[in-house]
Amino acid sequence: MEEYQVHLELDRSRQQDFLYPLIFREYIYGLAYGHDLNSSILVENGGYDNKSSLLIVKRLITRMYQQNHFLFSANDSNKNPFWGYNKNLYSQIISEGFAVVVEIPLSLQLSSSLEEAEIVKSYNNLRSIHSIFPFFEDKFTYLNYVSDVRIPYPIHLEILVQTLRYWVKDAPFFHLVRLFLYEYCNWNSLITPKKSISTFSKSNPRFLLFLYNFYVYEYESIFLFLRNKSSHLRLPSFSVLFERIYFYAKIEHQHLVEVFAKDFSSTLLFFKDPFIHYVRYQGKSILASKNAPFLMNKWKYYFILLWQCHFYVWSQPGAIHITQLSEHSFDFLGYFSNVRLNASVVRSQMLENSFIIEILMKKLDTIVPIILLIRSLAKAKFCNVLGHPISKPVWSDSSDFDIIDRFLRICRNLSHYYNGSSKKKSLYRIKYILRLSCIKTLARKHKSTVRAFLKGLGSEELLEEFFTEEEEILSLIFPRVSSTLQRLYRGRIWYLDIIFINDLVNRE
């Protein structure tokens, strides 16, 4: 973010009007590749002494407009369909630089929003996806109903371009955007095919993620705009928290009330609900409320009408599920969460009389989805579908140290992520599967049985790291209080350094 401000030096009042000329600036491509490559990427041929040239970018954009889309040669099969030239050079140069340029408006807006909200100091902790669960523990125990909302995607590309026009006033820039998207996706299709989306995501993931997050940001901005324009609702301010990596967004609204049509202006007070909470990560959001499901159903159809009428995306009403927190769990960020009653008995004595008081308290349970996680491990060939560990043949060619290190890293990552679980038994089972799979892989490499391998090499102590790693970390934090250590290890621990979901956890 600081690099953008140093290089661009844009006046914020005019920053959205002149994006097209930035495509011809060499430092844009330095920002795109400077952190990954030691030398410049703007090299058309290795014989040019690795000199970067602005003329290359201008030539490439000229070729885009002059290219005949109806003439294809059989010899062009190994070339990029977008350029007709070397795909490893031209497409990477323009696509990565182009993605940096289109991120600039939201980058500067992010910086200003963080400064206005005065949350810059705590921003690093808020970037962690585990920071959502303490919010659940604090707020959701007082709520009764939860709605599981999945944001529909993809949408027509022209809708995305028209949405961008409200934020960026630059006609030449949008001509280039249209041409850029046209070459990657089927522009004439109302709903972009999954095949073209997959191709586009592999060739330019940064720009695709920008478009997706901009689309989500736009539909959530409509909620905030209508709320601020409503004179009946006097609610606290909101905050938009972007994760800097690819602009994934995470928003927590403690008191969110939205009305989606002017016809409801006379009945706003009837729909006011001060106990609505909204949390989103990537394409999945959770809407929870304390009141009756009547309002939740209203919200459900508000979402559907907004997607259909404003973004022209079809969404089935059955795709949004409304459940009761005390009876059903909701799946979010790899955990099954629900609210249950926790009964405790307190004995009180007053003079000669004693009383036994039973107290019921609501508690948020976060459970490891063991069946789904075993399914992910089976897909990755660590076990079969029943959860029985198997060897990993593709790793048997590596050294013993590399094999153990790979299994340990996977085990530590899963343990690190699921240490917030209310019940540790499922986590121990996952550790057992990975531990035994590691032993079987080593035994397969040495052409021995598991028992003979452990007896001959004495590897049991080395493999105990699968179960002792978390205890060692907590012993460093609490070196003198063993009872506190045991209590914390049995309880939930949320880490504020997790900014993405592990591939085995993410089952989307």
From Swiss-Prot:
Name a Pfam family for this protein: Intron_maturas2
Which segments cross the bilayer?
none
By sequence similarity, the record places it as follows:
Belongs to the intron maturase 2 family. MatK subfamily.
UniProt-annotated location(s): Plastid, Chloroplast
Q: Which HAMAP family match?
A: MatK
**What are the leading ranks of the lineage?**
Eukaryota, Viridiplantae, Streptophyta, Embryophyta, Tracheophyta
Q: What are the BP-aspect GO terms? A: mRNA processing; RNA splicing; tRNA processing
Keyword Hydrolase present in the record's keywords: the answer is no
CC per GO annotation:
chloroplast
> What is the protein's major site of localization?
plastid
Q: Does the keyword Plastid apply?
A: yes
What this protein is called in its record is Maturase K
Q: Look up the domain of life of the source.
A: Eukaryota
Give the protein's biological function. Answer: Usually encoded in the trnK tRNA gene intron. Probably assists in splicing its own and other chloroplast group II introns.
The record ties this protein, via InterPro entries, to: Domain_X (IPR024937), Maturase_MatK (IPR002866), Maturase_MatK_N (IPR024942)
Which Gene Ontology MF annotations are present?
Answer: RNA binding
Q: What are the alphabetically sorted keywords of the record?
A: Chloroplast, mRNA processing, Plastid, RNA-binding, tRNA processing
